[in-house]
Amino acid sequence: AAAVLAYAEHIENPSVLAKALEHITTKHVSLDIQPEQYAIVGENLLHSISEVLDVAMDSDLIAAWQAAYMQLADLMISMEKNKYQTLASQHGGWTGWRAFKISAIERSGSAYLFSVTAQDGQAILSAQANTPISVRVSVPEQELLQPQQFKLSASTENSYQFLVECVAEPSPYSVAAILAQHYDVGDVLELSAPMTV
């Protein structure tokens, strides 16, 4: 909602928002956000605006907000498309989710250092420490896949390491807690490509 408001304030000169849009689209690509998801978010956002402002969904005000949202969505979809293409074209790059096998887990207190290798044995994208990466796991007892972003601790030509820190009372959907409590060496999880673009 904040991004839509900022966009509406700078609709005549969206380049003012370039840094913020770069950050948002990088996170979206890491989480594998797809163009069709923008329509769902937009519909929910417009309903929220309608409720908060107590105006009908078919009002001119909501139509104006919808137009601003769609312009912003189109801009972000275009930026994300370029990022996906760049990631896929790099040596070892990919888009979407890729299966990785856990090769080692080192524990230190409430922190876990996971080492993973690509299950398909193919090359992986070279990345530096602190590069954002998303990990997606199955939520126990739910038919749900949940992603969470982490930062790479290290990478080699065929493996990544990322640090998972657990909190005392995690949500049942916390990827960090699920990894710590339910995943072991040899298990498979999914990663998005490190956000090197």
Which residue ranges define each predicted feature?
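A short, basic/flexible loop-to-alpha-helix module at the beginning of a structural domain
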Residues: 193-197
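Structural and coupling elements of P-loop NTPases
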Residues: 189-191
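Ferredoxin-reductase
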Residues: 90-187
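Globin-like tetrapyrrole-binding proteins
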Residues: 1-97
